[in-house]
Swiss-Prot record:
Domain of life the protein comes from: Bacteria
Organism annotation: Prochlorococcus marinus (strain MIT 9313)
Alphabetical UniProt keywords: Ribonucleoprotein, Ribosomal protein, RNA-binding, rRNA-binding
Family matches, as Pfam families: Ribosomal_S19 (PF00203)
An MF annotation (GO) of this entry: structural constituent of ribosome
Keyword S-adenosyl-L-methionine: no
Chain's role: Protein S19 forms a complex with S13 that binds strongly to the 16S ribosomal RNA.
UniProt-recorded name of the protein: Small ribosomal subunit protein uS19
Key word Ribonucleoprotein present: yes
Family: Belongs to the universal ribosomal protein uS19 family.
SUPFAM superfamilies assigned to the protein according to its UniProt record, in alphabetical order: Ribosomal protein S19 (SSF54570)
Gene Ontology biological process terms, A to Z: ribosomal small subunit assembly; translation
Length: 91
């Protein structure tokens, strides 16, 4: 279930300030953020945002298809190492 239209999308204030400053300066350097819950807006297209996954910052390049999704969707928090092979073998 999505967020109410009258409320608008959530974006962290610090992230919004950094984006507006970079857009004004025509700067495209990497922005570090811990805000995985922030919604991707059209003004973010073309930026690289380093999203924290609990251990490190994962660089995410924002494209047009990502608009409306959350930043945390593109920085996985768990690593899948595969299923363990059957130890019994061929008895």
């Amino acid at each position: 279930m999505g967020r109410s239209l009258k409320k608008g999308p959530f974006i962290a204030d610090s992230l919004l300030r950094k984006l507006e400053k970079q857009n004004a300066d025509d700067d495209k350097s990497v922005i570090k953020t811990w805000s995985r819950a922030s919604t991707i807006l059209p003004m973010m297209i073309g930026h690289t945002i380093a999203v924290h996954n609990g251990r490190s910052h994962v660089p995410v390049f924002i494209t047009e298809q990502m608009v409306g999704h959350k930043l945390g969707e593109f920085a996985p928090t768990r690593t899948f190492k595969g299923h363990i092979k059957d130890k019994k073998g061929g008895r």
